[in-house]
């Protein structure tokens, strides 16, 4: 109440910001007359002038008014489009590192060019992020003439892009690409073996288009690069056969505590719980098929993977539904994005869920994966020096944008007042009754001559509605994940008179629906269009446009409410662009998931008590309020889940920064000798401590054990007993110093044999190999720790604090293991010739380039082991972090692959690699 009173007196924060920015707009407009008088050549020269002024110390803020005025004039000359004042305000918002909420059809694409041009003047690069490759390529081509006229280069990044082409795209002044590709390129850049292989420049300025979709809807989406793990396809197929005989509880809440059923489902969180009866039934089956011993249970530590298979299979059968959560296309299970209705080819759920769905659908079961590198969108985009974004719907999530990303949301006024009318929801008893109501509404709208866009939440709902419309003889188009190839064509004509388009959620988002249809799409199909033909087509379109406007514009029908108000607002926002008329209304039923799971019993009982017929609807404020409360609960739950994920990922992110920083140092540092010396001292000290404890007397020393360990681990023979016999005054400190000095002397001697350059190359390869190997293992350990950490709460411990403590301990152990393995490898290495070094480096790159990896996402991570990931597969990853490396091929201890496996070598013979070890102790080691 107090904030409202203060706001009415001094204005809201948004109003104050707009007032400040309008003063800047006045400065921009003051340049217009003088700039209009410039020739094209003079206008183009301004970019070089701005660059010189900026290098001379003038800030981008100071350049903004004139630079925006130049960009606006250039846009008018090149594209025939002049930025409105509200678009200038949006450009200022983006430049200041804020989020511009601009309604659909108000020109976000054109608005973004202002901030992109200004920030490209610094020469540090600007990244424009879109939700899919089509929009990235479309917007790049749309704006390339403008930026080219102004002397700015434009690049586009995409998956499977040739390496040099991608480097060139990142070197451009302005780069377009998807959030996935930027994130995966960041991870790939931190898996390369030389700085020359890196693609990205330091992350400078980023504008995210549809920022709510990327930083809110996909915030719980870890980006994961993974390699293949062991094949468990047989197990998934086996487990799949038992699921149909398990009995699901009919009333989840009422039966949660009885043992009559085998399992029940928490629909809100998409989790399953198995009863004791269910466990016994599953165990009996597994014992019968020989997968479980007579005295074993699913709770046995060694059998926990089996339990995970079972849980994944139950979720696949009873939580994940075909044509809602996924489709089967050409023998593959393809995930459907629930927020957009688009398919996500190549992405895969993790934790065995995707394999379980493949078994359920009886298609080929693909292998699971092991994580090699990972980050989240939340942490990746926070790496940019300046982050901004634009969308039509951000204000409802303003608090989350501020708390998570420190981003303010500025609501940009519309150029023309919004003429769309948003009608009250209509609520029906059943889904069929709701569909009948929707069809009646469509027929009434069609009779007026207006177009209709029907938004559905799932593919299944779109096909059900399509079937019913066919029965009624209503011509229509369907746009869902199965018809994505025709998306642009369908959306282009969705504003034509009497057209009916059914679309899953926000399919087609990013493309405006023009009243009367898009007349320019007809021209694209004609090779050469005469001016007369163009005028005729435009006149025909104008007649249709006027007809649709007279009929009330585009009518939006929502077939159910989404869990998020923001998604509902996005659907409404498809109508009423730039002052056009329009209407929107949502149709609901008590059988809708949102109503069934979240709406209160009071609402349901009230509607049933009214004795409504199936196809009769009510409009009531109490029902609308109940729906809003349900959506608020879901949004709050999702916000908490994202906030919880960030707490845990921040721990991993700090470790990631350390590892990636060390990797960059290794790649950039020419001389690693000093670091190698320190490693030797630390590793040898740690080993000595095991046999000669600090502060101990000589009776407590295990000298024989130390000699054996030095020989076994580092292949160095030290006559420590002889040293002690020769010098009785040699104490613990002196002995420690002598051992380390001897080890370093030996290493220096071997280093001189190799030569400075080759030695440095070998040291770098060993350190990179060890770092990558142990980081990969550490990620797996962190993942396992994270899945079970919530159980610490039952022991009255804080899971978050426990996670921080244990992850730090794991990190320290990993760093110790990297140092120990590096010193060990350098001590055991065969000194190669220059030719061997070159040949092995080529082999390393070839192995890395052909190594199959996966690029993954996770849709849900609520810290209880219920993680779902989606993966994008790549066939060629240059600079992979594993495979036979130079160091591994030469070291006795780095023998991931045996290059001599086919040579029939005796296990007691010397190893062919020249390490002076027996084959069974070197490359033939099992």
Swiss-Prot record:
Q: Which NCBIfam families match?
A: PRK12904.1, secA
Family (UniProt) = Belongs to the SecA family.
Write the Enzyme Commission number(s) for this entry.
7.4.2.8
HAMAP family on file? SecA (MF_01382)
Q: What gene is this protein a product of? A: secA
What does the UniProt entry say about where the protein is found? Cell inner membrane; Cytoplasm
Which residues are involved in binding ATP?
87, 105-109, 512
GO MF, any single term: protein-exporting ATPase activity
Q: Which InterPro entries match?
A: Helicase_ATP-bd (IPR014001), Helicase_C-like (IPR001650), P-loop_NTPase (IPR027417), SEC_C_motif (IPR004027), SecA (IPR000185), SecA_CS (IPR020937), SecA_DEAD (IPR011115), SecA_motor_DEAD (IPR014018)
A Gene Ontology cellular component where this protein is annotated is: cell envelope Sec protein transport complex
The way it spans or sits in the membrane comes to:
Peripheral membrane protein
Name used for this protein in its record = Protein translocase subunit SecA
Its function? Part of the Sec protein translocase complex. Interacts with the SecYEG preprotein conducting channel. Has a central role in coupling the hydrolysis of ATP to the transfer of proteins into and across the cell membrane, serving both as a receptor for the preprotein-SecB complex and as an ATP-driven molecular motor driving the stepwise translocation of polypeptide chains across the membrane.
- State the top-level EC class: translocase
The residues that the entry says bind Zn(2+) are: 911, 913, 922-923
Enzymatic reactions: ATP + H2O + cellular proteinSide 1 = ADP + phosphate + cellular proteinSide 2
Q: Quick one: where is this thing mainly located?
A: membrane
Quick one: a GO biological-process term for this protein?
A: intracellular protein transmembrane transport
SUPFAM superfamilies reported in the protein's UniProt record? Helical scaffold and wing domains of SecA, P-loop containing nucleoside triphosphate hydrolases, Pre-protein crosslinking domain of SecA
């Amino acid at each position: 109440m107090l904030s409202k009173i203060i706001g009415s007196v001094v204005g809201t924060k948004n109003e104050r910001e707009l007032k400040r920015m309008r003063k800047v707009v006045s400065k921009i407009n003051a340049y217009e007359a003088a700039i209009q008088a410039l020739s094209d050549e003079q206008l183009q020269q301004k970019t070089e002038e701005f660059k010189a002024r900026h290098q001379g110390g003038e800030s981008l803020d100071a350049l903004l008014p004139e630079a925006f005025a130049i960009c606006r004039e250039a846009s008018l000359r090149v594209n025939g489009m002049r930025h409105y004042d509200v678009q200038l305000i949006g450009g200022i918002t983006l430049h200041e590192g804020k989020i511009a909420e601009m309604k659909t059809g108000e020109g976000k694409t054109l608005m973004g060019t202002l901030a992109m041009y200004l920030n490209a003047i610094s020469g540090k690069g600007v990244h424009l992020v879109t939700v899919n490759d089509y929009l990235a390529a479309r917007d790049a081509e749309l704006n390339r003439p403008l930026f080219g006229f102004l002397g700015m280069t434009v690049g586009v990044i995409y998956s499977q892009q040739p390496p040099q082409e991608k480097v060139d795209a990142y070197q451009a002044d302005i780069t377009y690409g998807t959030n996935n590709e930027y994130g995966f390129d960041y991870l790939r850049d931190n898996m390369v073996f030389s700085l020359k292989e890196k693609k990205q420049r330091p992350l400078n300025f980023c504008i995210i288009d549809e920022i709510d979709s990327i930083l809110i809807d996909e915030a719980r989406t870890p980006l994961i690069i993974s390699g293949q793990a062991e094949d468990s396809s047989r197990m998934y197929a086996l487990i799949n056969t038992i699921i149909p005989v398990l009995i699901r509880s009919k009333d989840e809440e009422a039966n949660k505590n009885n043992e009559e059923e085998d399992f029940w489902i928490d629909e809100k969180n998409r989790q399953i719980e198995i009863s004791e009866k269910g466990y016994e039934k599953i165990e009996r089956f597994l014992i019968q098929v020989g997968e479980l011993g007579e005295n074993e249970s699913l709770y046995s530590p060694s059998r926990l993977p089996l339990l995970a298979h079972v849980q994944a299979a139950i979720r696949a059968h009873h939580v994940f539904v075909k044509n809602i959560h996924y489709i089967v296309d050409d023998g593959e299970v393809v995930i459907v994005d629930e927020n957009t209705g688009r398919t996500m080819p190549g992405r895969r759920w993790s934790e065995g869920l995707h394999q379980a769905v493949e078994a359920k659908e009886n298609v080929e079961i693909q292998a699971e994966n092991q994580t090699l590198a990972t980050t989240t969108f939340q942490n990746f985009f926070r790496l940019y020096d300046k982050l901004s974004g634009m969308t039509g719907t951000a204000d409802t999530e303003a608090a989350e944008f501020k708390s998570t990303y420190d981003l303010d949301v500025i609501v940009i006024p519309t150029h023309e007042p919004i003429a769309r009318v948003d009608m009250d929801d209509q609520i029906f008893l059943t889904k069929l009754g709701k569909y009948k109501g929707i069809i009646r509404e469509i027929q009434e709208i069609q009779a007026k001559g207006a177009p209709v866009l029907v938004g559905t939440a799932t593919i299944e709902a779109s096909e059900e509605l399509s079937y019913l419309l066919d029965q009624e003889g209503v011509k229509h188009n369907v746009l869902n994940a199965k018809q994505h190839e025709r998306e642009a064509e369908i959306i282009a004509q969705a504003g034509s008179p009497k057209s009916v388009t059914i679309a899953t959620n926000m399919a087609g988002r990013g493309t405006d629906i023009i009243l009367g249809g898009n007349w320019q799409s007809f021209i694209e199909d004609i090779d050469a269009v005469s001016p007369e033909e163009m005028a005729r087509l435009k006149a025909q379109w104008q007649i249709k446009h006027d007809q649709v406007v007279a009929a009330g514009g585009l009518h939006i029908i929502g077939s159910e409410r989404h869990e998020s108000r923001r998604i509902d607002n996005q659907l409404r926002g498809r109508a009423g662009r730039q002052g056009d008329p329009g209407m929107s209304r949502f149709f609901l039923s008590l059988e809708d998931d949102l109503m069934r799971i979240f709406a209160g019993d009071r609402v349901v009982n009230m509607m049933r008590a009214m004795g409504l017929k199936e196809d009769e609807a009510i409009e009531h404020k109490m029902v609308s309020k109940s729906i809003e409360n349900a959506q608020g609960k879901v949004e709050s739950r999702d916000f908490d889940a994202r906030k919880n994920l960030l707490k845990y990922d921040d721990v991993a992110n700090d470790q990631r920064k350390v590892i990636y920083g060390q990797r960059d140092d290794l790649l950039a540092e020419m001389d690693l000798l000093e670091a190698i010396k320190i490693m030797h001292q630390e590793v040898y000290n740690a080993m000595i401590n095991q046999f000669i404890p600090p502060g101990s007397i000589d009776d407590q020393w295990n000298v024989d054990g130390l000699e054996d360990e030095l020989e076994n681990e580092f292949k160095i023979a030290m006559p420590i007993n002889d040293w002690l016999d020769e010098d009785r005054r040699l104490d613990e400190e002196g002995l420690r110093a002598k051992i380390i000095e001897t080890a370093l002397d030996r290493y220096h001697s071997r280093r001189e044999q190799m030569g400075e350059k080759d030695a440095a190359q070998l040291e770098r390869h060993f350190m990179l190999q060890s770092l990558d190997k142990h980081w990969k293992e550490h990620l797996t350990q962190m993942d396992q720790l994270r899945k079970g950490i919530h159980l610490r709460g039952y022991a009255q411990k804080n899971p978050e604090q426990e996670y921080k403590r244990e992850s730090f301990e794991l990190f320290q152990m990993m760093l110790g293991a990297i140092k120990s393995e590096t010193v060990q490898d350098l001590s055991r290495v065969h000194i190669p010739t220059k030719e061997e070094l070159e040949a092995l480096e080529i082999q390393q790159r070839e192995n890395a380039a052909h190594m199959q990896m996966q690029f993954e996402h996770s849709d849900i991570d609520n810290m209880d082991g219920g993680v779902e990931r989606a993966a994008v597969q790549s066939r060629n990853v240059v600079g992979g972090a594993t495979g036979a490396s130079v160091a591994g091929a030469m070291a006795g201890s780095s023998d991931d692959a045996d290059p001599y496996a086919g040579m029939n070598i005796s296990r007691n013979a010397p190893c062919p690699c020249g390490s002076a070890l027996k084959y069974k102790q070197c490359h033939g080691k099992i």
